[in-house]
Structure formats: C-alpha cells, structure tokens
Amino acid sequence: MAKLRVGIIFGGQSAEHEVSLQSAKNIVETIDENKFEVVLFGIDKEGQWHINNKLNYLIYGENETYIALNKSNKHIAIIPGRKHDQFIQIDMLEQLVQLDVIFPIVHGTLGEDGNLQGLLRMANLPFVGSTVLGSAVSMDKDIAKRLLRDADLEVTPSITLTRINRENFSYDQIITYLGSSLFVKPANQGSSVGVSKVINRISFDQALALAFCFDDKVLVESAINGRELECAVLGNHDPQASLCGEIVLSDNFYSYEKKYLNEHGAVVVVPAAISKEVSNNIQKIAVRAFQALNCTGMARVDVFLTTNNKVLVNEVNTSPGFTSISMYPKLWQASGISYPALITRLIELAIERYYAEQKKISHRDIYNKIDTGSA
C-alpha cells in the first residue's frame, strides 16, 4: 500500500511560534513512517513559507528556549483552487510534490483562527482539525463563551472590553460584578500569551495595557477557586472524550513560562484524581462544548471544577499543543491511544471529512434535481 504524503505546516507569525516548532518536532519524530511520508512547510515570523528538509528544518531543535525555524530553505507559494500541485517553488516557478493531506500545527493567530483553514479549504486540500467556522469561533474567547452559554453550558464569568468600549467600565464596576481577584487575557491568543493575574487597580491597568498589545478585544474574567482540568475530544460526527487530566500549579497561574519553559512550574496529573461520576460529567460537557462550537477532528476542552463540583468551561482549543509535555496526546495515551495511533486517526478524520464535503452537491445541482414548482 502506497504511503500517504502528509504536509506538516508549522511555525507562523504569532507569539506561539516556538511552541509550534516544538509540536512539529514531536509529530515528525512520532508519525508512523510505514504509513506516511512527511513534507515540511515552515512559516517564518515574517509570514514567508519555506519547504524544509527533515534533516535541517530546525535550528537548536533540542533547546526549548532557543529553538528556531531554518529559513535558508526554498520559499514557496500556494495556488488556491487546484486539485493537485497546489504548492510551487517561487524562485523556480516549479510545481512541488503532490500532497494527500495537511497537518497544520500552527498555533495562535493566523494559524488556528480560521485563516489558515480557509486557505487550505480554498486550495482543495484535506486538513487535520476544525474547519474555518469551528476554528474561528473557538479562537475568539468572547464569541466562544456566547455560543457555549447558548448551549446551556456554564462558563467562567467575564466582561469583554474593546478599544472602543473600555472606558465604559471602571475598575470598581468590574470588581463589583466579577470580584476582586481577576484574570485579564487577549480574546484571540493561546498558551497564556498576554494573560495576567489581577489583584488591585494598579495591576489591572498594567494587565489591560499588556493584553491590548496582543488584541483589540480583551476578556476580564473572575478568578475561579477550583481545580483546573482538561479533557481531549477526538472525532467528527461522533466525537469521543478522553480521560480527564489535571494541572496542579506551583502557584495560582498557569503562565506561558510554566507551560513550556519551566519544568517545575506545574505538575500534570493524568488521569485526574476525581470520581467516576465527575469524570463522566466533564467528558459529556467536553463533547457538548466541542459540538456547540462546530469543532471537528480534535480539541482540548479546559474546565474548572469548583469546590461544590460545578463544572465551568474555560476554553476550547482546536489546535492543542503536541509538545513533549502537552496534555492532548498525554490524555489519549492514558485513554489507550498511543501517540502514533493518535496522529494516524487525526489524519483519517481529516480525509473522512474532506470526502464527505466533496459529496455535497452544488447550488446548481440542487436546482437541477429539485422541482421548485415554478412555471
């Protein structure tokens, strides 16, 4: 049986560029080479695309602090709408390899917010993860909360501020509604980029200034007194939930540094030490959240478990990390799906969704096949 050619897209222009490099490195090292041939596409911080060699696509690949994309490789462009040969080498105008499926592992803005997904959809390529809509609404924490509330799911209490309306809410008004212990975060960032813990007016002003550096929309949320749990979801029309995992913090904030740079910043417990009843409830909520946001393929659902066992949905991440310490693959490993098998299943789901979409008839076909009753 011929191998499927998988294009792994990584890097990107967001603040999570280095996290994406780590994720790509793990996927490349773990993917089943008996089934798949890997083609590497690195996006540098200026937004240029490079086709990379598996032997030298990273610089300082073993150093999580200094890891970087090798930008000396060929620049490429993508041609939307073609059935095959969508990628060309810019300087030679040569068509590159034909791909069977794309595994995008670009985190953050322009990577998991629907932009890259739209480009791949226009290029007529199957790709792993959610479609344009699911990616976009999940990335925007404000929109995601609205949809989750509409689906009768409880979320962390919050107020959304923009550059236009920020003066309409005073600090005193906000703490009256949300309490004095707060988190401030950009609406469209991940990996805790731009997130601050707030305990007073001074730290609130500083947190807002930082968050608005990353986005034009900012969420101010109540700091929840509870446990931070995560559940992985996998599937398309019949999604399944993994066992739950818990983030046990050395203090009360799971920052970017604790997630990726400080191995002592947090302890990941998989499976979480919770009752079967609570675990089942979180799994059901995770699947409902996945479906409410129109997700497909994969997502990691982050929740808070309060002292009275109330479950509050915090975030839904449609492009979870695949680094050596990332929760998504760990949760599935604990649930009986190995890392290579997980990658294989995600690729299968991408192709499954692609061919299901190809079967949809066009609007012209509808009018040809349906008698509208018009004269």
UniProtKB/Swiss-Prot annotation:
What pathway does the UniProt record associate with this protein? Cell wall biogenesis; peptidoglycan biosynthesis
**Primary subcellular site in the record, as a coarse category:** cytoplasm
Keyword entries, A-Z? ATP-binding, Cell shape, Cell wall biogenesis/degradation, Cytoplasm, Ligase, Magnesium, Manganese, Metal-binding, Nucleotide-binding, Peptidoglycan synthesis
Q: Name one GO molecular function term.
A: metal ion binding
- A matching Pfam family: Dala_Dala_lig_N
InterPro entries named among the record's database cross-references: ATP-grasp (IPR011761), ATP_grasp_subdomain_1 (IPR013815), D-Ala_lig_Van_CS (IPR000291), D_ala_D_ala (IPR005905), Dala_Dala_lig_C (IPR011095), Dala_Dala_lig_N (IPR011127), PreATP-grasp_dom_sf (IPR016185)
Q: What is its EC number?
A: 6.3.2.4
Presence of keyword Cell wall biogenesis/degradation? yes
Binding-site residues for Mg(2+) 1, renumbered to this chain: 302, 315
The kind of enzyme this is, by top-level EC class, is ligase
Domain ATP-grasp per the UniProt entry, residue ranges: 145-348
Show the catalytic activity: 2 D-alanine + ATP = D-alanyl-D-alanine + ADP + phosphate + H(+)
As for subcellular location, the record says: Cytoplasm
GO biological process entries: cell wall organization; peptidoglycan biosynthetic process; regulation of cell shape
- Which residues hold ATP? 175-230
Instruction: Summarize where Mg(2+) 2 binds, as residue positions.
Output: 315, 317
Q: Which cofactor does it need?
A: Mg(2+); Mn(2+)
Q: Which NCBIfam families match?
A: D_ala_D_alaTIGR, PRK01372.1, PRK01966.1-1, PRK01966.1-4
Tell me which family the UniProt entry assigns to this protein.
Belongs to the D-alanine--D-alanine ligase family.
HAMAP family found in the cross-reference section:
Dala_Dala_lig
Give the protein's function: Cell wall formation.
Q: What is this protein called?
A: D-alanine--D-alanine ligase
Q: Which organism is it from?
A: Baumannia cicadellinicola subsp. Homalodisca coagulata
